[in-house]
Amino acid sequence: MRSVSPALACRFLRRRVKPRLTFAQTLTEAARAFALNFPYEAPEGGFRRQRLGGVPTETCGAGTPLLYLHGGAFFAGTPKSYRPIAAGFAAQGFQVFTPAYRLAPRHIFPAAFEDARAAFAALAEERGAVALAGDSAGAGLALGVMAARRRDGESLPGAAALFSPWTDLAVTGASARENEGRDPMFTRKMLKTASHAYLAGASPRDPRASPLYAELSGLPPLMIHVAEDELLRDDALRFVARARRAGVETTLRLWPRVPHCWQLAQGVMAEGLASLQEAAGFLRERAK
C-alpha cells in the first residue's frame, strides 16, 4: 500500500487545490477544484444504491447502521467522492449509508438539512439504533439534525462522530482569520462564498444551518476531531465548549499538521486511519 505523509498531502492541496478554490469565478469551478483533492483511493466494488426517505443513497458494508453525511461546503462532494471514508467505516464493522443530499446553488437552504433529516429518519425507522457521522458541512448537518430531532422529541443516534464540523456559517471563528495562511485548502473568502450560496439570504444563525447556535442539551455523546491549522478549528472548539456547558458528553481531539478532512486518506495515511478507527471505536462502544 502506498504511504502518504500529512506534509505531502498538505503540499499537494496548497499547490493544486487552494489556488483553484481561491480564484474560482463560479461555484462550478470551485466544485471542480474540490474534485482535484488528493487522489485517495477506495475500492470500486461493494457499493450499492438505494433511497432513504426519498434521498438517493449509496451503501456499503454490513453491521451496525451508520449514516455518513459527506462534506463539500454545501456545493460539492458526492457519495462516490467520499467512498474512502465509507469503506473505512465498513471495514470497522458498519453498514454505511451516504446520502446524496441536494447541493447549492441549485438547491438552497434548507434543502441539504431536509434531505439529511429525511435520510436519518428513514434509516432510524427501518433499523432502529443508528450511528451518525460526518465531516465539515456534513458534520454540521449531522449536528443540526440531532438538535432538531431532540427539540421535536424524536429518537437520536446512540452517538455521533464529527470530523472538522462546520458549525457557524456566519464564519465568526477567530481561526477563520488566524489560520488562513496555514490552512492548506481553504480561505475565509471561500467559506463566506459557500455560506452565501447555500443560505441565499437566510440567517447564518439559523440552528438548522449553524448548530453552534442550537439548543444542545440532551444530545448524545459526541466525538469531534479537528486539525489545529484549519480554518474550522474554532467552529469545533466553540461548539465543544457550548455542548459541554449544556451537559453533553463530548470528546475532542486536536490533530497537528494534517489537512482538512484527512480521514479521506485513511487508506494511505496513518493519521487518517487512526482518526477513523478512533471514531469507529467510539461509535461501536456506544451502540452496545
Q: Which residues make up each language-model segment?
A:
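Hydrolase active-site cap/lid region
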Residues: A147-A202
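A glycine/proline-hinged amphipathic helix-loop "lid/cap" segment
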Residues: M1-T59, K288
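Catalytic nucleophile-loop/oxyanion-hole region of alpha/beta-hydrolase
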Residues: G77-P79, I85, F97-A129, Q266-G272
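Short beta-strand immediately N-terminal to the catalytic nucleophile in serine-hydrolase-like folds
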Residues: L132-G134, F163, W255
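Short beta-strand element of the alpha/beta-hydrolase
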Residues: G63-A73
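Catalytic active-site module of serine/aspartate enzymes centered on a nucleophile-bearing elbow/loop
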Residues: V268-K288
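Gly/Ala-rich beta-loop-alpha elbow adjacent to hydrolase catalytic centers
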Residues: G134, G138, A142
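Short beta-strand/loop motif that positions the catalytic acidic residue
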Residues: I224-V226
